Amino acid sequence: MNAVEQISGYGLSATDEPVQLPARPEPLAMKASETALIVVDMQNAYASRGGYLDLAGFDVSATQPVIAKIRQALNAARAAGMQVIFLQNGWDNGYVEAGGPGSPNWHKSNALKTMRKRPELAGTLLAKGGWDYALVDELAPQPGDILVPKPRYSGFFNSQLDSTLRARGIRNLVFTGIATNVCVESTLRDGFHLEYFGVVLADATHQAGPEFAQQAALYNIETFFGWVSSVDAFCQSFAAAPEVAVAS
C-alpha cells in the first residue's frame, strides 16, 4: 500500500476479542469496541430527594446503592475503552417539547401532572438548565462520554442516539439507570426493534413504583427483548479485556 493511501471505515483497527457476559437467559458474547454502556436518566429528578419522582409520591430512598453500582460499571467500561452514553430526559423551559394537550405525554407524564396539581412547582420539573434536570453530582460525565438529551421515555425517540451508535459501529447496549420499568425498558425495547442487543444490569437500575414493577420489567426484558446481568458480572467479564480506542 502506498504511504499516502488511506482506508476508511470505523473499527478497522479494533482487535479486541469478544468476552462472554454471564446473563439470563443465556450468556452474551460482546466486544468492548462494539458496546456502549448506557446510563439512563440519572438526574436529580429521578434519584434525589426533592426531585420530580419524590415530589410525585414515588419512593427514591433506594437510589443511592444504584448510584454506587453505576459508578462501578462506569469505571469498568471506561477502563475497557467502552463508549459511555448518558441519556437525559426533559424539555425546554417553556415545555414546548413536552407536546401540549394534543400529546398523550402531556396527559401521562407525572412530572407535568404534578406541576398542574401544584402550581408553585411550575417550570421547575425536568426543565433544561434546572436542578431537577441535571445529572446527579456523583455521576458527572467524563471526557469522551456522550450526553444525549431525549424528550420522551425512549432514548431513541426524536434523538440522535441511533445515529451516534451506528457511526461508532456499536451493536450492544448495556443499560443502567432509572426507571427500569419506564425509560430503561422503553429504550431497550426500541433498540431491540432497531437490531441492537440490549442487556440490563439489574442491580444498577431501579423502578418507579412497587418492587413488582422492577421484576415485571426484568421478566419482559429477559423473556422477550434482551438479557439480564449484574454489575459484578459485567466488571469481571471486561476486566481482562484489552483497552480499545473509543471514537469521539
Curated annotation (Swiss-Prot):
Q: Which SUPFAM superfamilies match?
A: Isochorismatase-like hydrolases (SSF52499)
Gene Ontology terms describing biological process: nitrogen utilization; uracil catabolic process
Entry's CDD domains?
A: cysteine_hydrolases (cd00431)
Catalytic activity, reaction form: (Z)-3-ureidoacrylate + H2O + H(+) = (Z)-3-aminoacrylate + NH4(+) + CO2; (Z)-3-ureidoacrylate + H2O = (Z)-3-aminoacrylate + carbamate + H(+); (Z)-2-methylureidoacrylate + H2O + H(+) = (Z)-2-methylaminoacrylate + NH4(+) + CO2
Statement: the UniProt record of this protein carries the keyword Hydrolase? yes
A GO molecular function for this record?
hydrolase activity, acting on carbon-nitrogen (but not peptide) bonds, in linear amides
- Which residues carry out catalysis? D41, K150, C183
Report the InterPro entries cross-referenced here. Isochorismatase-like_dom, Isochorismatase-like_hydrls, Isochorismatase-like_sf, RutB
Keywords per UniProt:
Hydrolase
Name the domain of life: Bacteria
What EC numbers are recorded for this enzyme?
3.5.1.110
Stored Pfam families: Isochorismatase (PF00857)
* Job of this protein: Hydrolyzes ureidoacrylate to form aminoacrylate and carbamate. The carbamate hydrolyzes spontaneously, thereby releasing one of the nitrogen atoms of the pyrimidine ring as ammonia and one of its carbon atoms as CO2.
| Family listed | Belongs to the isochorismatase family. RutB subfamily.
- Name-wise, this protein is Ureidoacrylate amidohydrolase RutB
Organism for this UniProt entry = Stutzerimonas stutzeri (strain A1501) (Pseudomonas stutzeri)
